[in-house]
Amino acid sequence: MPVEPEPSPWVFPSRAELAALPVLDDVEADVEADGDGRHDGSDLVAVGADLAPGTLLAAYRNGLFPMPEGRSIGWWSPAFRGVLRLDELHVSRSLRRAARDFEIRVDTAFDEVVAACADPRRPHGWIDGRIARAYGELHRLGWAHSVEAWRDGRLAGGLYGVAIGGLFAGESMFHRVTDASKVALLGLVEGLRSDPDGAAGRRLVDVQWATRHLCGLGVREIPRAGYLAALEDLLAVPVAALWERGHPGRAG
């Protein structure tokens, strides 16, 4: 079981306060709609605080996640949240075939996954040393996890995020081999689906923004208020067995 850290001294906006935030742009005309998902001027809701474990968990429980904002930390709650329901993952025949060439492992190379996601050569990189250290500490406490796609004994791709109850808040993913990040996502979903307690239908993968790439895998947008309303039930779901036992094996 994950270890609950010291509570944060910081107070974030409540879920009710966040749900009441207006969308600042005209959804039909002015909201950016590109390969990176739709971004609204109201997505950034706070700046400051710290990245202590208790602060991070308080943020996720209120529907927020951190990204660097200059030298400070920004706290984000997208007006249009990208989410993946476990029964809505789109798996093409080619991806299913490709998955046979990979082995899925959980939490065997967390730091390496984060480092690969933070590679400064990647476009639009945002993971700095502060973020890497903070999530490493969350991992050691049992809250942050990696799902890894291995091939021929080498890490080929993966993803990492934070698991609280029925919520998996995905932070980033990478691949060194074609389709490896998609296979890791498939491994995540299949691992959560295999829950022996029957809670799979009450779990959700949060991907922050619905990029064009992720929409092709079944991700869709929901309004901020809808996401925040779902959080209360999600947080009450038991921890997935996937994070307790790991899930080595083949995806697909």
List PLM regions with ranges.
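N-acyltransferase acceptor-side catalytic subdomain
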Residues: 1-252
